[in-house]
Amino acid sequence: MKNWYVLYVKSRHEFVANNELMKKEVETFLPALKSLRQWKDRKRWVEFPLFPGYLFVNIHPQPESIVSVLRTRGAITLLSAQPGHPSPVPNEEISSLQLLLDSGRDLDIYPELKEGTRVRVKRGPLQGAEGTLEKKHDQYIFLINIELLGRSIGVKMYADDIEAN
């Protein structure tokens, strides 16, 4: 019997891994939201994963199936409570998530990240720097005010690169 599992993938490889798994005829579920992004010369709707770094796969809990998934480009590991034993996700949770996305409601993916919140940079060239969240540009991009060397610098950062202090 097939079960749903959470597949952890490389940063910003959610859609790559999803497409590769679909080529292998593995049933996947990549919850994503659309957001209108604006560049200097154009606007475009862009899809962003609801859970950055993760997607769901529906496979048999047999070693061959697990190895096939893990050999997919961008895949890192299946989440597990015990090493070597991936933890299944109940079908009801997947169904609820699908219903929530199909409802068309606006979802706040990072409710803990509000304007004025103190944040710390988790990765990238500014790793370890602390600042204040000034503005939310869209679901995933925030303007952070960081004080470095006596100066205040505004930096746009992806939400998965920062955390609330």
Q: Where do the language-model regions lie?
A:
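Ferredoxin-like alpha/beta domains used as RNA- or RNAP-binding modules
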Residues: 1-165
